[in-house]
């Protein structure tokens, strides 16, 4: 008699623990939230912290940049030029082990303009279990 209630209790605890487990996409989504927060505060150093030390930034119409210092300088220049806000909508996130690929659409505010576009990011989870951007490429819809 005691066995059945104990089995049900264990099953309930196991299932409730599974319900609280984050999805595979949650790590990159949480890191992207940090990116958006820093971006919308025009915090170039905060944006750069979401990237791996050897990350690649591939802005449309510009040379490829490598490393967090170059990425920080790029975003500081963009903020100084009038970039002020970003909204991102994930279209698809595919996760395999410690790598993830995210395709998103975005709208960036530049001075008084709204610029829509799309991007692809490669995320990598480090030994510290933090997801960081390894590669970021984008272009506008116009």
Locations of the language-model features?
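Bacterial N-terminal signal peptides that target proteins for export
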Residues: 1-7
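Bacterial N-terminal signal peptides
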Residues: 7-16
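A short gly/proline-enriched turn/hairpin at secondary-structure junctions
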Residues: 55-66, 77-82
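Structural motif
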Residues: 51, 96, 126-127
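Short beta-strand edge/turn micro-motifs at domain boundaries
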Residues: 116-142
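Surface-exposed, charged secondary-structure patches
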Residues: 70-112
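A mature extracytoplasmic/lumenal domain signature
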Residues: 51, 61, 92, 105-106, ...
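Short, low-complexity N-terminal intrinsically disordered segments enriched in polar/charged residues
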Residues: 2, 16-53, 69
């Amino acid at each position: 008699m005691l066995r059945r209630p104990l089995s049900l209790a264990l099953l309930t605890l196991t299932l409730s623990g599974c319900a609280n487990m984050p999805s595979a996409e949650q790590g990159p989504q949480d890191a992207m939230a940090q990116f958006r927060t820093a971006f919308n505060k025009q915090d170039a150093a905060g944006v750069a912290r979401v990237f791996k030390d050897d990350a690649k930034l591939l802005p449309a119409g510009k040379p490829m940049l490598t490393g967090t210092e170059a990425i920080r300088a790029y975003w500081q220049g963009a903020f100084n030029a009038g970039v002020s806000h970003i909204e991102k909508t994930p279209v698809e996130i595919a996760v395999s082990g410690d790598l993830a690929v995210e395709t998103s659409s975005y709208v960036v505010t530049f001075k008084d303009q709204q610029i829509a576009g799309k991007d692809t990011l490669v995320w990598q989870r480090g030994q510290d279990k933090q997801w960081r951007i390894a590669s970021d490429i984008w272009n506008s819809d116009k």
